[in-house]
Amino acid sequence: MIALLLFLVTSRTVTAQSEVVDEPEANPGRPTVSTPATLTPVGYLQFETGFTPAYDSPEFSSRYSLNEVIKLTIASRLEFLVQAEPIANFTTDGATANRPADIFLGAQGVLYHGEGATPTLAVSYFHRVYDGGAPEFDYGSPTNSFLVLASADVKGFHYDANAFLTELVQEPVRRGQFGQSLTISHPFLKRFTLSGELWHFTQPFLRGNAIGNLWAVSYTARKNLVFDTGFNHGLSGTSTRWEAFVGFTYLLPHRLWKAQ
């Protein structure tokens, strides 16, 4: 993956410079459904790379995919994002195939910078620019997505809360979808963080609800490098029964342009 190559190339340079210049700090958005309302450092590329096996879902019996999110904050209140699954291997109706999945372009804007228990508030928008045709997870693959995000720290715990309004399409029919997610995280053993999450999405074409409970552990190897692993268990009959996650978030330590 792109992030792994960049990490290997830059690691020696970063080590040599670490005594002189502090590393910028990554702001992971994976592997939870919720996205932080806060943005990545201005002028730095952040890569969120992972592998996701999943089992027993309405559209597949098994699915294995690589996933990548690239983020770039260009101002203190504006971030651009690319989200993609380069390849997905899946089994459905007894047949196994490989296919690229979807690509999304999006932007996130901060409405209010909070501090401590006062939440940071943001909104974001995503549009699917490529449909690879791979079977989707229980919450579908929206053509358009609008999110409202809030993040804050309260008594040693951090939370990320998202509300989703999306558009699902099965030609020629278009239907609205609603969702909510809440992630609560707490650090332990200095470099580790435990995250628990509950999420819900309506399923307008199935006339059901996808509900899941996700747990993840992350390890901060450096300020700009965070590893993660976890799992998600579907709680409704039309949810993906099991998903696992393993990956990392890497913030490229070189600013793309000089600070103002």
Task: Name every feature range the model reports, one short phrase each.
Residues 4:
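Catalytic cores of secreted/periplasmic lytic hydrolases that degrade extracellular macromolecules
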